[in-house]
């Protein structure tokens, strides 16, 4: 997969639209590599997800964040120049903002417990049959 990404990026760089295009690469599984390659010192991590943006409109100095896939929605939109009030959309927090993600604010266990709960509203939209009231 990494060779395919490399090939695509090299091809994209030759296209007229490249400088006006943001490429978002989102990992879908853990990878192993030397920690210093992705900015971790002293072997503090050996397995991690690799997510990165090429040519984002915005940049950030904050590198190490605790985030989930919920945070990709506002982050991707801000990476292409969208203005998001308070840096939040739905349950996601833009990683370009100074807003803490839900994982940073509440922790993984707390978020997992809340998301496992039953939602009457979700059940209504999932199971509601037209004509029944």
What feature does the model see in each segment?
Residues 2-39, 77:
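Metal-dependent active-site segment of extracytoplasmic phospho-/sulfohydrolases and closely related
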């Amino acid at each position: 997969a990494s060779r395919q990404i490399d090939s695509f990026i090299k091809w994209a760089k030759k296209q007229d639209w490249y400088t006006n295009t943001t490429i978002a690469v989102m990992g879908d599984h853990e990878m192993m590599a030397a920690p210093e390659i992705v900015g971790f010192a002293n072997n503090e991590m050996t397995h991690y997800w690799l997510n990165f943006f090429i040519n984002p409109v915005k940049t950030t100095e904050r590198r190490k964040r605790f985030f989930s896939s919920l945070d990709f929605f506002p982050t991707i939109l801000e990476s292409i120049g969208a203005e998001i009030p308070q840096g939040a959309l739905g349950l996601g927090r833009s990683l370009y903002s100074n807003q803490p993600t839900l994982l940073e604010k509440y922790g993984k266990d707390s978020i997992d417990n809340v998301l496992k709960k039953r939602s009457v509203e979700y059940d209504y939209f999932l199971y509601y049959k037209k004509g029944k009231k």
